[in-house]
Structures are given as structure tokens and as C-alpha cells.
């Protein structure tokens, strides 16, 4: 079983480390995504290029790589392997070896692995994100609010192990958004659709 668990973790990491935002913007001929806006490779920064279609595609593919890793691991290793694949995918997106361990902030992958493990929680995350984004126009705040609620939701609905996993992922997500949190506190955070 140890071998299966390691395989699930590695599989998740490899899936998660695929930098779709960077790949899509290069194919589209835009400037290097890491040199504009926040320098992040995720969908929010892709949106700052003005290419809404590319941003949507990045969001979708970043989420689906997490979902795919979870479902594949579940197929060969069960629920425990699926959760390890979720962890691996999240870490792979945050710290991809191909980009010198400088990746995205993990929101789309967070949604994707959540979708693969327990889809009602992913639905709740999306509703919370959309509601917060609609009222505040802050992508970062929307993600932080939704992620904060996710482990609580999982625990409440009888998934303590999964809740523990997502508590860890949420802490990592908050850490990756530490600069956004500072800007939110100072009132200098960019709103959705704004270019930096």
C-alpha cells in the first residue's frame, strides 16, 4: 500500500505541476505571464492580459488537472490515495519543478480536487466565491472566504479526514495569498478586471 500511496502523491504532483496559464498564453502569443500583473501563472493574472477566453480556459484546465489526478488515484488506490493525489496536485501547482518551484496560488486546483473528492463542497466553494466576488470584486478575498469555510463544511457533513486535509490546503492557500492579504488590509488590492 505504501507504494500505491507514493504513486498517488507523485501522480498528483505531476498533474498539478502542468502550468496551463503559461502554456496557453504562450500559444496565444501574449507576453510572458510572469512579467505582467502579479507575475502569477493562474487565471486571475491571465485575465489581466485582457484575454477572457484564455483566463476561463486556464481556470477550467487548472481545476480539471486536480480532478483528474484525484479520480485516477481513487481508481487504483481508493479514498486514501485520492486524498494524497489531491495534496500532490495542490503542491505541484504551487511548487512546479519545471518553473523552479514558482507556481500559482492554488485556487483553481483547490476547487478541482474538492470536486473530485466531494462535489457538494466544491459547489459550496463556488457559490461562496461568486457571492463574495459579486459584492467585493476581489478575487483573492473571495477565494480566502470560500477556502476558510470549506474544512468546516466538510467536518460538519461527516468527513473529518478530508476536513483535515483541506485545513492544511487552506493554510497553504492563505500563505500563498499573504501579499494579497496585506494589500487588502491597506486598500491597494486590485479588483477583478483591473490591470496592475
Swiss-Prot record:
Compartments reported by the entry: Cell inner membrane
EC number: 2.3.1.275
Pathway(s) this gene product operates in, as recorded in its UniProt entry: Lipid metabolism; phospholipid metabolism
Record membrane topology: Multi-pass membrane protein
Annotated catalysed reactions: an acyl phosphate + sn-glycerol 3-phosphate = a 1-acyl-sn-glycero-3-phosphate + phosphate
GO molecular function term, any single one: acyl-phosphate glycerol-3-phosphate acyltransferase activity
Subunit structure, as described in the record: Probably interacts with PlsX.
UniProt-recorded name of the protein: Glycerol-3-phosphate acyltransferase
Organism: Rhodopseudomonas palustris (strain BisB5)
Amino acid at each position: 500500500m505504501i507504494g500505491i500511496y507514493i504513486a498517488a502523491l507523485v501522480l498528483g504532483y505531476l498533474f498539478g505541476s502542468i502550468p496551463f496559464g503559461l502554456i496557453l498564453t504562450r500559444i496565444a502569443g501574449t507576453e510572458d505571464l510572469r512579467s505582467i500583473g502579479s507575475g502569477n501563472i493562474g487565471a486571475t493574472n491571465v485575465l489581466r492580459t485582457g484575454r477572457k477566453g484564455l483566463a476561463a480556459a486556464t481556470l477550467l484546465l487548472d481545476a480539471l488537472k486536480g480532478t483528474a489526478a484525484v479520480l485516477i488515484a481513487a481508481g487504483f488506490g481508493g479514498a486514501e490515495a485520492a486524498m494524497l493525489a489531491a495534496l500532490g496536485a495542490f503542491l505541484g501547482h504551487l511548487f512546479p519543478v519545471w518553473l523552479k518551484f514558482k507556481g500559482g496560488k492554488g485556487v483553481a486546483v483547490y476547487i478541482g480536487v474538492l470536486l473530485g473528492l466531494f462535489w457538494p463542497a466544491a459547489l459550496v466553494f463556488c457559490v461562496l466565491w461568486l457571492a463574495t466576488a459579486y459584492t467585493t470584486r476581489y478575487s483573492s478575498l473571495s477565494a480566502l472566504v470560500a477556502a476558510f469555510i470549506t474544512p468546516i463544511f466538510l467536518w460538519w457533513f461527516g468527513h473529518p479526514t478530508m476536513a483535515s486535509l483541506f485545513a492544511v490546503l487552506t493554510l497553504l492557500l492563505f500563505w500563498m495569498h499573504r501579499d494579497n492579504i496585506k494589500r487588502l488590509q491597506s486598500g491597494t488590492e486590485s479588483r477583478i478586471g483591473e490591470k496592475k
